[in-house]
Each structure stands twice: as C-alpha cells, then as structure tokens.
C-alpha cells in the first residue's frame, strides 16, 4: 500500500477517523520513511466549517505537518445540478484531493474509510438499485487512493483515539438523519446489528470477494471489447454476446466510454426485455439480428446527392459507382417510406428485403441507396441490384459497418 520514500497526502476533515489516520501516519512515518501532507476542504455546508478548518490548521502546526486547505461553496453548486448534496460534496472533495496531490507531488492519497463506511455504502447502493458488481465499493487501494483503516471497525478506531488522546472535532450534521448516509447509519445499521452483531465483518468479506469478481469481469469485458466492439462517428456496434450478464456489462462499458455515465442497473436490464431502450437525452441501446448498437437518437435528414465521381463515403459505407453511360445520371439518398426495388421481374418493398437479409434496424436509414432521375431504387449496396440498373454500370460495396451484411461477405440477389 505504501512504499519507502513516498509522499502521502492525507485527507483530513477534523473528525475522529481522519484525525486518527493523520496521527498514525505521523507516528509511523519515520519507520515507513514516508513524507506526509494534510489536506482539508471547507465545503461551506455548515456554519461551523470554518472552525473545523482552523482546528486542522492548528493541529498540523503543532504536529509539524504541512497542510493544504481550500474552500468551495458546495450548496451553490448543488442547486441546479440534479444531484444530491452528498454527491456534489464528494465530487468536489475528490477533485480537490487529486489537484492538491499533484500540486505537492504526492503519489498517494490516504482516506480514513473503515468497515462501517463500507457497510453503509453497500446498504446505500442496494437501496438505490445497484447491480452485483456495484457491491465492489471502497477498495483498500484504487489508483492513487489508499484506505489503511478499511480493515478496522469504527469502534476500534474510536477506542484507539481515546487511548492516545487524539484531538478531533464533532460534525453536528453527522446526526441529522435527513441525510441519506446518516439515516442508514443511525436507523438501519442498528437494526442489522441486532440480527448480526458482526455485520460489518460479514459485509467486508462479501465486498472482498466481489472485488475479485469485478476484476475477473473487467478482464473478460476488455477482451470482448477489443475483439468485438466497433466505434463509428456517432454510434458503436458490437456482436450480441450469448451470455446475458456479459451483454449487460459490455453495454455498460460502451455507454460509459461514449457518454461518461451509465444508467441504473434496473433500467439497463430493460435492454434484455426490449429490442430498443432509450435512456437520458436520447441515448439508446438497440438489438437487431445478433448485433447491438449504442448511440444517440438522431433524426436523419433526407439527402439526395448526385454521383459525380467513382467513390463515395458516408455513414460508415464506402461504395464504388463507375458510370459507363453518358445518357444516365445517378444519385444516392437514404431510404424513404414506401421504397421498392424490382429484381428479376419481381417488385418488393425495401423494408421486406431488409428483413429477409437480416439487416439490423439501425442501419436501414443509413445505407446510401443508388437511384436514377426518376428516384427509382437501382441498387442497395451489398443487398440487391435492380433490373433497371444497366449491366455496364459497375457498382461495388467496398466498406460497410460491422453486421450490415451477414457472413462477412455481400450478395446482390433477392
């Protein structure tokens, strides 16, 4: 967790947990041969927050520990954020810690989380509707963050602090049950402890195993992504995994990679029940003929572009049209309602052709159709060639999005 010569930034609120962590790291820093710096952020949520800041600064002077402090008006940021006050405070705090660590040259950031914090987080996530891997929370070490106290209960830390006379301040809002975390701590956890007095240890074991499971799943997902996920201009496509759990995790990964967030697990499960599910701001997941598309709903503008050269590239397609006729002009456009094509003397709806050839629904408005001046469909790239397209006009589908044509090849007979 710590190596000789490292510089550790210690997150200190002034409460008993973080002050005890600062005390322990200061005490053992000569033995561990590490350098420590304290960091305190005033969230300006409470009137007494300035008192906490001054307390931390005073103790750090007494203990000869460098300290970095700052303040952020979290309530102002919270007003129009659409998030809870606790969520905003956490985001601001972690941002401050990362920036401060970089400023002072610290390679590690020490946090005072313990087993009770772990229990409260698990309960909170279960209430909100987490997936199974969502229980892999608060790891002992992740990126630059370390949590040396995660193996201890709150009661053990408090007992040690009393024995050593560690100074600290009390945050009066810790007892205000209007905050979700406090409600869990003071109302729900005591009931759980009536059923199992060592519930903190039980949850710690559960989370430890879930971390191992998450690591395995992350490796499996990464391997699948590297082999099967394709990103285009405004969407991604991948082969639909046979395993439903892998499907959910790959979908989560793609959503986070593209948009920086994921839906609640309950909403994500909805993709197993429906062919198409929309989340926030028009973001969708659509399943069709063994492929999955993830993107943002965009109402495609109808276009009609004259073919003037041999090569055209659009919507992930690359086509070649060699016009050997001086008496004909061609255009490409996307499909229209009621489009039909005549092949071998038989007229068929373009929609039926797409279904028969198992063209995923999310490609049907993207494929560039070759038409004549009468707007008749002459060629559906890789799918069908009309009787009206002269034989001396050369057409070829050179590139296309994954899954557009099955089997990795294309054919033009209907």
Swiss-Prot record:
Annotated keywords: ATP-binding, Cytoplasm, Ligase, Nucleotide-binding, tRNA processing
A Pfam family reported for this protein in Swiss-Prot or TrEMBL: ATP_bind_3
GO CC entries: cytoplasm
Enzymatic reactions: cytidine(34) in tRNA(Ile2) + L-lysine + ATP = lysidine(34) in tRNA(Ile2) + AMP + diphosphate + H(+)
InterPro entries per UniProt: Lysidine-tRNA-synth_C (IPR012796), Rossmann-like_a/b/a_fold (IPR014729), TilS/TtcA_N (IPR011063), tRNA_Ile_lys_synt (IPR012094), tRNA_Ile_lys_synt_N (IPR012795)
EC number: 6.3.4.19
Domain of life the protein comes from: Bacteria
Gene Ontology biological process terms, A to Z: tRNA modification
Described purpose of this protein according to its UniProt entry: Ligates lysine onto the cytidine present at position 34 of the AUA codon-specific tRNA(Ile) that contains the anticodon CAU, in an ATP-dependent manner. Cytidine is converted to lysidine, thus changing the amino acid specificity of the tRNA from methionine to isoleucine.
HAMAP family documented for this protein: tRNA_Ile_lys_synt
Record protein name field: tRNA(Ile)-lysidine synthase
Species annotation: Thermotoga sp. (strain RQ2)
Gene assigned in the entry: tilS
């Amino acid at each position: 967790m710590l190596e000789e010569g490292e510089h550790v930034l210690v997150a200190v609120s002034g409460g008993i947990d973080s002050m005890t962590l600062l005390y322990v790291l200061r005490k053992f820093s000569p033995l561990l041969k590490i350098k420590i710096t304290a960091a305190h952020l005033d969230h300006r949520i409470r009137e007494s927050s300035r008192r906490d800041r001054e307390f931390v600064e005073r103790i750090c002077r007494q203990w000869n520990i460098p300290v970095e402090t700052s303040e952020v008006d979290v309530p102002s940021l919270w007003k129009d954020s659409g998030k809870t006050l606790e969520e905003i405070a956490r985001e601001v705090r972690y941002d401050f810690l990362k920036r401060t660590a970089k400023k002072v040259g610290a390679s590690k950031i020490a946090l005072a989380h313990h087993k009770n914090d772990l229990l409260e987080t698990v309960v909170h996530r279960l209430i909100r509707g987490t997936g199974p891997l969502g229980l892999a929370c608060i790891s002992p070490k992740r990126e630059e963050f370390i949590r040396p106290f995660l193996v201890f209960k709150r009661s053990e830390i408090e007992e040690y602090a009393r024995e050593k006379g560690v100074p600290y301040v009390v945050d009066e809002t810790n007892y205000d049950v209007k905050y979700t975390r406090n409600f869990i701590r003071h109302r729900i956890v005591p009931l759980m402890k009536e059923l199992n007095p060592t519930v903190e240890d039980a949850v710690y074991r559960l989370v430890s195993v879930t971390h191992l499971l998450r690591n395995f799943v992350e490796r499996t997902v990464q391997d699948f992504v590297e082999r099967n996920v394709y990103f285009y201009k405004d969407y991604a496509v991948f082969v639909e995994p046979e395993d439903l759990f892998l499907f959910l995790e790959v979908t989560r990964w793609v959503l986070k990679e593209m948009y920086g967030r994921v839906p609640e697990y309950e909403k994500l499960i909805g993709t197993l029940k429906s062919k198409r599910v929309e989340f926030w701001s028009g973001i969708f997941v659509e399943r069709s003929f063994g492929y999955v598309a993830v993107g943002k709903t965009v109402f495609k503008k109808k276009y009609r572009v004259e073919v003037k050269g041999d090569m055209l590239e659009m919507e992930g397609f690359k086509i070649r049209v060699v016009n050997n006729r001086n008496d004909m002009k061609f255009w490409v456009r996307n499909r229209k309602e009621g489009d039909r094509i005549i092949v071998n003397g038989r007229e068929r709806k373009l929609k039926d052709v797409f279904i028969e050839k198992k063209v995923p629904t999310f490609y049907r408005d993207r494929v560039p159709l070759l038409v004549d001046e009468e707007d008749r469909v002459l060629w559906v790239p890789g799918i069908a060639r009309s009787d009206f397209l002269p034989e001396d006009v050369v057409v070829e589908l050179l590139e296309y999005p994954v899954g557009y044509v099955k089997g990795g090849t294309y054919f033009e007979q209907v």
